[in-house]
């Protein structure tokens, strides 16, 4: 029933198995990839014809994580997988970016690549497995895919490169989380987060990954030899030479003149005029010819721009290849935000704000590994007005999610620990102008806004986007590329970092032939550019502010003994709710006894802190505390102090002079200062008010004269003056001998008095005297 084909190899200490022929047999290509106990199914389908009038390549990649893969049921009301999560969107982009350039120009058939995680072992990251499965499925599908590619994750732990570590382990135990996708001969994509690694260390990691990737590519080729379908028979020959020549003759000079205009709007208008002129020249041709002519027009523009850069080193806006556009940075220009910056580089501009919050503002993330919370968020928005266009404005798309995550990776390594800075941090970046490298503007502006908010970052971070023009043996690396240079170039290479090293690197390469020499030149040139940008940022703000904004919440942390946690929380949360309701501060306590008290009002924090300290601390003899009278009795008043302790102020300790009644001095609910005089063995606390200034709480000198010592009882003489005190027995008469009581009965009871013994004694109640 099944014609199953399988290949396996040992890779990174685990077995990687690629299988086809058992599942999803109606797809053009389907591969089940197993690595460890993580299993990913990837299926590829392709439309057999091109939609009429279509002039682009509609490749769609979907990556989905099934909760059942980890033995979990989705949380929330709807118990099924919903729309793509941020992680699923990012992995979809990871698959798309290295695959898209490997389809031939002019191939416009729609292709769907769907990767689903079916099993997850908690150790092997499924994104790498999905990228390998997608490449294998495309390779055996028969579509004109010029692969295969493969992918690998690299960590840098204790000075050694490690293949395919778990993602969180890579950064917890090491300094690097790097994903590389490549063909057998060329690196196609790099995505990374690093803890200030040097350029050489980053380059070494990329080359290490490429060597390991080649092993997987060999396995994919083996699978294709066993199971690949016949390649599609399509005509992709370039028959546009005549059209291209006609366009160059017609509008070549107009295009060259347009690209010499340094202003983006003026340049765009001039190019649109040239395109309209070209379109008019083919107005009498058929619709297909017109479409081909306009596609060829883009090639004409690319040839003119690329030729000028390679031949003369002349860029679109007149800069040299290493020159960075003018930069202006402003901080604190939004009065009510916790931190803000306006970062402008040429015609790219970002408004960045930083907002500080408490623990309850953390982002809840539900995934295969369970529920977790993230205390650092960065959200990137790209409205259509930023490029002078009319377009959709609403929920973020894949591009916005990807750019935001890139900036997040750049800034995350320099954040303080939760212990150093217990705030939730959210950076919002709104791109207000864009002409290249808006994600790196977000890095620079986001860093400045955090510093303006008082976030103690380790070091400032700057970022730069690099480009590449490659023609044969000639190449030019461009610093701080424009949008047009990005579209017309062969590489988009973004690097961010501090003065000490790289924190993130992202690379998308559109052509083969990127050599180590080109990598080294690009990294060196990027380092120089980052240093220049960092200098410009320092002019606006050199280091993080030492004070938080007046509008930001304050958080104080308090560590208590674990045994005291239940005392602070109370039965059913009664105590902690009372603290919050009374003081107005937020109080969070974790299982380790770390308490976070937060409020925008410092007096509320202080009140809650003192309350908690009163619960967990022991009173000290001789120390003065502020308390509240909670009960008044005849002999004194009970005072509650340290939040949860009561002590007695005896009436004699209220004032130095005599006090008749405690209510003459205090009343219930009154705040008083008390000094601890004594704590007995049972924990009872004796307090004094008279030795404390009730206005200031300062200790007073005890001015009460000491009591005169009593005469010792042994010196009271023979006490003869007291007389004989009513004689030997006074009026009671002589003590009876007891004989008239009679002997006790056997049961120990006295004999009952006989009525004939005489009249009842006078002291007896009347009802006992009665004879009735």
Curated annotation (Swiss-Prot):
<dbReference type="Pfam" id="PF00575">
    <property type="entry name" value="S1"/>
</dbReference>
<dbReference type="Pfam" id="PF03725">
    <property type="entry name" value="RNase_PH_C"/>
</dbReference>
<dbReference type="InterPro" id="IPR036456">
    <property type="entry name" value="PNPase_PH_RNA-bd_sf"/>
</dbReference>
<keyword id="KW-0548">Nucleotidyltransferase</keyword>
<dbReference type="InterPro" id="IPR001247">
    <property type="entry name" value="ExoRNase_PH_dom1"/>
</dbReference>
<comment type="similarity">
    <text>Belongs to the polyribonucleotide nucleotidyltransferase family.</text>
</comment>
<feature type="domain" description="S1 motif">
    <location>
        <begin position="622"/>
        <end position="690"/>
    </location>
</feature>
<dbReference type="GO" id="GO:0000175">
    <property type="term" value="F:3'-5'-RNA exonuclease activity"/>
</dbReference>
<dbReference type="InterPro" id="IPR036612">
    <property type="entry name" value="KH_dom_type_1_sf"/>
</dbReference>
<dbReference type="GO" id="GO:0006396">
    <property type="term" value="P:RNA processing"/>
</dbReference>
<dbReference type="InterPro" id="IPR012162">
    <property type="entry name" value="PNPase"/>
</dbReference>
<dbReference type="Pfam" id="PF00013">
    <property type="entry name" value="KH_1"/>
</dbReference>
<dbReference type="InterPro" id="IPR004088">
    <property type="entry name" value="KH_dom_type_1"/>
</dbReference>
<dbReference type="GO" id="GO:0004654">
    <property type="term" value="F:polyribonucleotide nucleotidyltransferase activity"/>
</dbReference>
<dbReference type="InterPro" id="IPR036345">
    <property type="entry name" value="ExoRNase_PH_dom2_sf"/>
</dbReference>
<keyword id="KW-0808">Transferase</keyword>
<keyword id="KW-0460">Magnesium</keyword>
<feature type="compositionally biased region" description="Basic and acidic residues">
    <location>
        <begin position="701"/>
        <end position="760"/>
    </location>
</feature>
<feature type="region of interest" description="Disordered">
    <location>
        <begin position="695"/>
        <end position="772"/>
    </location>
</feature>
<dbReference type="InterPro" id="IPR015848">
    <property type="entry name" value="PNPase_PH_RNA-bd_bac/org-type"/>
</dbReference>
<protein>
    <recommendedName>
        <fullName>Polyribonucleotide nucleotidyltransferase</fullName>
        <ecNumber>2.7.7.8</ecNumber>
    </recommendedName>
</protein>
<dbReference type="Pfam" id="PF03726">
    <property type="entry name" value="PNPase"/>
</dbReference>
<dbReference type="InterPro" id="IPR004087">
    <property type="entry name" value="KH_dom"/>
</dbReference>
<dbReference type="InterPro" id="IPR015847">
    <property type="entry name" value="ExoRNase_PH_dom2"/>
</dbReference>
<dbReference type="Pfam" id="PF01138">
    <property type="entry name" value="RNase_PH"/>
</dbReference>
<comment type="function">
    <text>Involved in mRNA degradation. Catalyzes the phosphorolysis of single-stranded polyribonucleotides processively in the 3'- to 5'-direction.</text>
</comment>
<keyword id="KW-0479">Metal-binding</keyword>
<dbReference type="GO" id="GO:0000287">
    <property type="term" value="F:magnesium ion binding"/>
</dbReference>
<dbReference type="GO" id="GO:0003723">
    <property type="term" value="F:RNA binding"/>
</dbReference>
<dbReference type="InterPro" id="IPR020568">
    <property type="entry name" value="Ribosomal_Su5_D2-typ_SF"/>
</dbReference>
<feature type="binding site">
    <location>
        <position position="492"/>
    </location>
    <ligand>
        <name>Mg(2+)</name>
    </ligand>
</feature>
<dbReference type="GO" id="GO:0005829">
    <property type="term" value="C:cytosol"/>
</dbReference>
<feature type="binding site">
    <location>
        <position position="486"/>
    </location>
    <ligand>
        <name>Mg(2+)</name>
    </ligand>
</feature>
<feature type="domain" description="KH">
    <location>
        <begin position="553"/>
        <end position="612"/>
    </location>
</feature>
<dbReference type="GO" id="GO:0006402">
    <property type="term" value="P:mRNA catabolic process"/>
</dbReference>
<dbReference type="InterPro" id="IPR027408">
    <property type="entry name" value="PNPase/RNase_PH_dom_sf"/>
</dbReference>
<dbReference type="InterPro" id="IPR012340">
    <property type="entry name" value="NA-bd_OB-fold"/>
</dbReference>
<dbReference type="InterPro" id="IPR003029">
    <property type="entry name" value="S1_domain"/>
</dbReference>
<keyword id="KW-0694">RNA-binding</keyword>
<keyword id="KW-0963">Cytoplasm</keyword>
């Amino acid at each position: 029933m099944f014609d199953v084909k399988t290949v396996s190899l040992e890779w990174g200490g685990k077995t990687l198995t690629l299988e086809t022929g058992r599942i999803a047999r109606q797809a053009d290509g389907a591969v089940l990839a197993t690595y460890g106990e993580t299993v990913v199914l990837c299926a590829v389908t392709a439309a057999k014809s091109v939609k009429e009038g279509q002039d682009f390549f509609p490749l769609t990649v979907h990556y989905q994580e099934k909760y059942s893969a980890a033995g979990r049921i989705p949380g929330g009301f709807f118990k099924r997988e919903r729309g793509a999560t941020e992680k699923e969107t990012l992995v979809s982009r990871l698959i798309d970016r290295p695959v898209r350039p490997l389809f031939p120009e002019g191939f416009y058939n729609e292709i769907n690549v769907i990767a689903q995680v079916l099993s997850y072992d908690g150790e092997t990251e499924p994104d790498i497995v999905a990228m390998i499965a997608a490449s294998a499925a495309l390779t055996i599908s028969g579509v004109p895919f010029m692969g295969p590619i493969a992918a690998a994750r690299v960590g840098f732990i204790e000075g050694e490169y490690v293949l395919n570590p778990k993602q969180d382990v890579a950064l917890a135990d090491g300094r690097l989380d790097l994903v590389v996708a490549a063909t057998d001969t060329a690196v196609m994509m790099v995505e990374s987060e690093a803890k200030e690694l040097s350029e050489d260390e980053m380059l070494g990691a990329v080359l290490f990954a490429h060597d390991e990737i080649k092993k997987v590519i060999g396995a994919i080729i083996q699978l294709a030899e066993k199971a690949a379908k016949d390649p599609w028979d399509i005509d992709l020959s370039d028959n546009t030479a005549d059209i291209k020549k006609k366009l160059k003759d017609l509008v070549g000079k107009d295009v060259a003149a347009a690209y010499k205009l340094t202003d983006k709007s003026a340049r765009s208008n001039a190019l649109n005029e040239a395109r309209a002129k070209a379109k008019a020249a083919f107005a009498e041709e058929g619709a297909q010819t017109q479409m081909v002519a306009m596609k060829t027009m883009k090639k004409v523009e690319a040839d003119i721009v690329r030729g000028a850069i390679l031949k003369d080193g002349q860029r679109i806006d007149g800069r040299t290849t290493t020159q960075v556009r003018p930069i202006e940075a402003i901080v604190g220009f939004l009065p009510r935000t916790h931190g803000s910056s306006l970062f402008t580089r040429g015609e790219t501009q970002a408004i960045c704000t930083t907002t500080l919050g408490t623990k309850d503002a953390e982002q809840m993330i539900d995934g295969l590994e369970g529920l977790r919370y993230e205390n650092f968020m960065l959200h990137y928005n790209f409205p259509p007005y930023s490029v002078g266009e009319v377009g959709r404005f609403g929920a973020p798309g894949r591009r916005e999610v990807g750019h935001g995550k890139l900036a997040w990776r750049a800034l995350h390594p320099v954040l303080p620990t939760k212990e150093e800075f217990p705030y939730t941090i959210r950076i919002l970046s709104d791109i207000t102008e864009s002409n290249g490298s808006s994600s790196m503007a977000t890095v620079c502006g986001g860093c400045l806004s955090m510093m303006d908010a008082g976030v103690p970052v380790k070091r400032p971070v700057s970022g730069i986007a690099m480009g590449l023009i490659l023609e044969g043996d000639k190449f030019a690396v461009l610093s701080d590329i424009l949008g047009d240079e990005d579209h017309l170039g062969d590489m988009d290479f973004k690097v961010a970092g501090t003065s000490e090293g790289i924190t993130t690197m992202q690379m998308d390469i559109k052509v083969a032939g990127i050599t180590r020499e080109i990598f080294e030149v690009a990294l060196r040139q990027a380092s120089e550019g980052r240093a220049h940008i960092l200098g410009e940022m320092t002019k606006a703000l050199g280091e993080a502010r030492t004070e938080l904004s007046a509008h930001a919440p304050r958080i104080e942390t308090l560590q208590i003994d674990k045994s005291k946690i239940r005392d602070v929380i109370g039965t059913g949360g009664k105590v902690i709710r009372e603290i919050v309701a009374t003081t107005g501060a937020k109080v969070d306590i974790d299982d380790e006894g770390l308490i976070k008290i937060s409020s925008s009002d410092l007096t509320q924090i202080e009140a809650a802190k003192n309350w908690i300290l009163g619960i967990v601390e022991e009173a000290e003899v001789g120390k003065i505390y502020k308390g509240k009278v909670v009960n008044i009795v005849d002999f004194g008043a009970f005072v509650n102090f340290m939040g949860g302790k009561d002590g007695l102020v005896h009436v004699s300790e209220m004032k130095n002079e005599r006090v008749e009644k405690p209510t003459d001095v205090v009343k219930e609910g009154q705040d008083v200062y008390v000094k601890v005089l004594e704590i007995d063995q049972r924990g009872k606390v004796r307090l004094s008010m008279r030795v404390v200034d009730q206005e200031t709480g300062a200790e007073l000198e005890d001015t009460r004269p000491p009591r005169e010592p009593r005469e010792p009882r042994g010196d009271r003489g023979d006490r003869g003056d007291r007389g004989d005190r009513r004689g030997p027995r006074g009026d009671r008469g002589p003590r009876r001998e007891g004989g008239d009581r009679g002997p006790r009965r056997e049961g120990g009871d006295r004999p009952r008095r006989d009525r004939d013994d005489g009249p009842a004694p006078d002291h007896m109640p009347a009802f006992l005297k009665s004879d009735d």
